Amino acid sequence: MSISAHGAKICGLSTPETVKAAFDGAAAFLGFVFFDKSPRNVAPEVAARLVEPVRGRGVQTVAVTVDPDDALIDRLMATMRPDLIQVHGKETPSRVREIAARAGVGVIKAFSVSSSADVDQAAAFDGVAQHLMFDARPVEGSVLPGGTGARFDWGLLAGRRFSRPHFLAGGLDPWNVGEAIKTSGTPLVDVSSGVERGPGLKDPALISAFLDAVKRAKD
């Protein structure tokens, strides 16, 4: 698939109903989490069943991981067969290159952000990652690298130029995503907890509302 330069990613999907809501709302990316500490964690075999109805229908599927080992990469590619793998840990540029080569698909590299110096880290992944993602730095002691509802100063991304399409993530919801897009100038947005009624419980109505808000912001 070609590199998407605009749109929204709904992350942490786990039911047929929420996958349908994301697809019907024209989400560009559907994210499935493979991290056992997350309330959104699903087995690769479950994700494979969830993506089957939308496979090849113009949406990119994303396997979201944290410092994945080769065994997990192999299992994901043998079952879910995602279009992209997202890495949300302490992966180095060389490790991201290894993952991309092993999987044979592009990689989204996520960065935890609280200052402009954190945004600067992206330069080291030039030519390595297919997409970049800037997420809020989790509070100290959190076991989750993302999906916490925390947000950072969107203005840190304003006017920045990157060699790859980039996502804004962290604390987005149907009510603030329009402002976030306007302030940051970011072409891609990612949401997880902002479309939930409880930890890991995605709400189809909130997914639809979020995607509608993204469309309005880009009109």
UniProtKB/Swiss-Prot annotation:
Pfam families: PRAI. It catalyses: N-(5-phospho-beta-D-ribosyl)anthranilate = 1-(2-carboxyphenylamino)-1-deoxy-D-ribulose 5-phosphate. Keywords: Amino-acid biosynthesis, Aromatic amino acid biosynthesis, Isomerase, Tryptophan biosynthesis. The keyword Transit peptide does not apply. One of its GO terms (biological process) is L-tryptophan biosynthetic process. GO terms for molecular function: phosphoribosylanthranilate isomerase activity. Pathway: Amino-acid biosynthesis; L-tryptophan biosynthesis; L-tryptophan from chorismate: step 3/5. Its EC number is 5.3.1.24. It is an enzyme of class 5 (isomerase). Belongs to the TrpF family. NCBIfam families: PRK01222.1-1 (NF002295). This is N-(5'-phosphoribosyl)anthranilate isomerase.
